[in-house]
Amino acid sequence: MEELTIWEQHTATLYKDPRRGFGIAVSGGHDRASGSVVVSDVVPGSPAEGRLRTGDHIVMVNGVSVENVTSAFAIQILKTCTKTANVTVKRPRRVQLPATKASPASGHQLSDQEEADHGRGYEGDSSSGSGRSWGERSRRSRAGRRGRVGSHGRRSSGGGSEANGLDLVSGYKRLPKQDVLMRPLKSVLVKRRNSEEFGVKLGSQIFIKHITESGLAARNHGLQEGDLILQINGVSSANLSLSDTRRLIEKSEGELTLLVLRDSGQFLVNIPPAVSDSDSSLMEDISDLTSELSQAPPSHVPPPPLKGQRSPEDSQTDSPVETPQPRRRERSVNSRAIAEPESPGESRYDIYRVPSRQSLEDRGYSPDTRVVSFPKGASIGLRLAGGNDVGIFVSGVQAGSPADGQGIQEGDEILQVNGMPFRNLTREEAVQFLLGLPPGEDMELVTQSKTGHSLRRWSQSRVGDSFYIRTHFELEPSPPYGLGFTRGDVFHVVDTLYPGSGPGHGHSSHGGLWLAARMGRDLREQERGVIPNQSRAEQLASLEAAQRAAGVGPGASVGSNPRAEFWRLRSLRRGTKKASTQRSREDLSALTRQGHYPPYERVVLREASFKRPVVILGPVADIAMKKLTTEMPEEFEIAESMSRTDSPSKIIKLDTVRVIAERDKHALLDVTPSAIERLNYVQYYPIVIFCAPESRPALKALREWLAPASRRSSRRLYAQAQKLQKHSGHLFTATIPLHGTSDSWYQEVKAVIQQQQARPIWTAEDQLNSSSEDLDLTGHGLAASSGDLSCDSRTNSDYEDTDGEGAYTDREGGPQDVDEEVAPTALARSSEPVWVDDHQGLMGHGTTITDKWETQADSHYTQDQRRQDSMRTYKHEALRKKFTRARDVESSDDEGYDWGPATDL
């Protein structure tokens, strides 16, 4: 017997325990000897006990792949999971395979008993009672011809009319013994009560249906029709859908490795066909991987259902091939069936085929989904809960509403509405979509019931929305719960319809609120509060740009204090400096407009697959860059600059950074703060290290010790460093203090670069599908000069040989008081994580939180609008009282589930 290790794929949903967490320990990673991230321990009594095992290989966490990553990256991904984690693992299983023998001569096949022994041999047991070994069984006589067309039964070598069916095990599936003609059987399961379950767990196995004569498989002679595919490029094929298999094969990039199990009886390719072999539309085919899957019109026409009653799947049956009938209009969500042509003495059998591409099953929906239709009235009569992390659920139904009449119940998951998938929508997006439907329009909902322990467990977890955003504008905090932020801050949004705001609430015209937690530099959640939603953020960002253009908002080019006015008037006398200073002052805001970046950008945590560029800021930047390239030329390379055609300043081409990264080196850049912003926008994500001087005398002593021949002014370098820390602190990855005359700061620089390269970074969500090796980011929507990085080194280092007066930074306005207290930026703030598991304490403040934002964005709120808000609040309250079957969030456990945040429609 030969042993074979196959990989079974399992997905477990873990709910974090407040004391034990998820209850697993992980180790390994591609930086370790094991290579894969492995579950090294499972804590007894934890959520992972009974679901995960020691030795499981973690493949995916909440949709993020953790294959070929470091263990630190996998741990960070698990840490970002707030309350729930969907963990997909690979679990090895050893199976016994019989020793291979020469295949029988063409036109012959194994006897029925031999085929049964073959199936049992794969299982690796001796329960069949046959004491013979595989070698003895292989020497048994073979007789009979196998008919590919016509007769579909197998007869024994003795010519009897009965034979044992094929008992085949392929990972998850065992095909039961069939009768002589392998007739399909029809079984109807009818629910008597809603609490009943069908009690069937289905599995699937991919097999080779057909081999084209012109393909590589036909020329290789290593594959045959009917072979069971166990692995595709090392990934177990058990329970994979055809669409998932297609995507897996398309990612093979020219080399496809298949682990197959030979089915000598070719049972799967000999299933009695109900239609002609030429009707390929009835079985979805993935052989043509160069084109999209399509569903061709069938050659025969499906008649009305055999029975008058409508099943939950609304299944239909096709008429016999010989008598085509006019085609009935079908719903795309139906699961159709085909029937065996009737013959004398035989009854009719339904063979449920592989669902079409348009069916719900192929899109990941289970067969117990329901389709309900009703016209939209003044109100929909539903209360929605959940979000993009768990799905959209019905947490309440208004008695007497059309939804109630169609049988929608509390706990139903809404999968689709009028062709719009709801599985990845936030609660705010789902509510806005439903409210956007005009009254009187027919609504077709695809729902799925969630009952039992899984429903209670989900409702108690209080999870819903979960995604991460990066901000691209500035906002002042609005106490007590309104969070402020600057450009580059990252937030974890957990509720897109914070109680008391948004669609369906009385304050909707004031703008909605998102409940979010600020992410710290350690990738942990810090303080939690509310921020404006997407539409409100767009208004505030536009207001910020308008105020900056008018010179009255934050970051405006014209100062309001006397000292700023003095520097402004002084810059007017320096005509050559004014244009450059003013242009660079507006560069950051203009960059956002040029790149078409929204106020909020969806981001995900991902490991960098290339050597990130390094920007060193501060009074010793030139010394650090020179030492790095001298000591480690194989790791670092200074990006060369070139002169502008219309300006004496210099630039660095983005292509230069890309070329250095392709050499597996860190590009050392001497660029301006706005160029750092641009690098982040085009997803190069530089490592920005700021060397902070302790004082001007200490800086002078350090420069004299490190570079005694330098003539650069310590006063000027210190002033530049103060200004950088004040205005560009949000760009710093790390800040290293300069103490004394030792080189400890240089050792810290090298350590920071090494640590940051290994850490995951926040990358744009919409770029996940691009190649990780493609660093050429041309065509990302930037302006014509987006490929250039300004490297006027007076802005961030001490390359200036003169000590003349001038603008301190190329990207800031006129000089300001550098002695002012430097306020720490949002990303630089260090505070202990504050967890607010039950954010009901924030309820009731939805109006007061937005007062300051409303004053900033709209000072013309009329009395008529306030009256409309009052009427809307009254209607909302009246609608809530009509809910007889919905549970309020304050209800007790005896009354029903605590659904957490929910929205009435």
From Swiss-Prot:
Any single GO CC term annotated in Swiss-Prot or TrEMBL for this entry: cytosol
Gene Ontology BP term (one): regulation of G1/S transition of mitotic cell cycle
Family designation: Belongs to the MAGUK family.
Signal peptide: none
Role of this protein: Tjp1, Tjp2, and Tjp3 are closely related scaffolding proteins that link tight junction (TJ) transmembrane proteins such as claudins, junctional adhesion molecules, and occludin to the actin cytoskeleton. The tight junction acts to limit movement of substances through the paracellular space and as a boundary between the compositionally distinct apical and basolateral plasma membrane domains of epithelial and endothelial cells. Binds and recruits PatJ to tight junctions where it connects and stabilizes apical and lateral components of tight junctions.
Region (Disordered) residue spans: 92-167, 289-367, 773-818, 850-905
InterPro entries found in the cross-reference section: GK/Ca_channel_bsu, Guanylate_kin-like_dom, P-loop_NTPase, PDZ, PDZ_sf, SH3-like_dom_sf, SH3_domain, ZO
Organism this protein belongs to: Mus musculus (Mouse)
SMART domains tied to this protein: GuKc (SM00072), PDZ (SM00228)
Domain PDZ: 11-93, 187-264, 368-434
Assembly description: Interacts with occludin OCLN, claudins and TPJ1. Interacts with PATJ. Interacts with UBN1. Interacts with FASLG. Interacts with CCND1.
Keywords recorded for this protein, A-Z: Cell junction, Cell membrane, Membrane, Nucleus, Phosphoprotein, Repeat, SH3 domain, Tight junction
Protein name (Swiss-Prot/TrEMBL): Tight junction protein ZO-3
Membrane topology: Peripheral membrane protein
Predominant cellular place of this UniProt entry's protein: membrane
Pfam families, per the entry: Guanylate_kin, PDZ, SH3_2
Residue spans of biased composition, Basic and acidic residues class: 851-877
Domain SH3 positions: 464-541
Tissue specificity comment: Is concentrated in various types of epithelium, in tissues such as the lung, liver and kidney, but not in endothelium or at cadherin-based cell-cell adhesion sites.
Compositional bias of kind Basic residues: 139-155
Extent of Low complexity compositional bias: 124-133
Domain Guanylate kinase-like: 573-754
Post-translational modification: Phosphorylated.
Phosphoserine modified-residue sites: 111, 128, 156-157, 161, 195, 311, 319, 343, 359, 584, 891-892
Nucleus listed as a keyword: yes
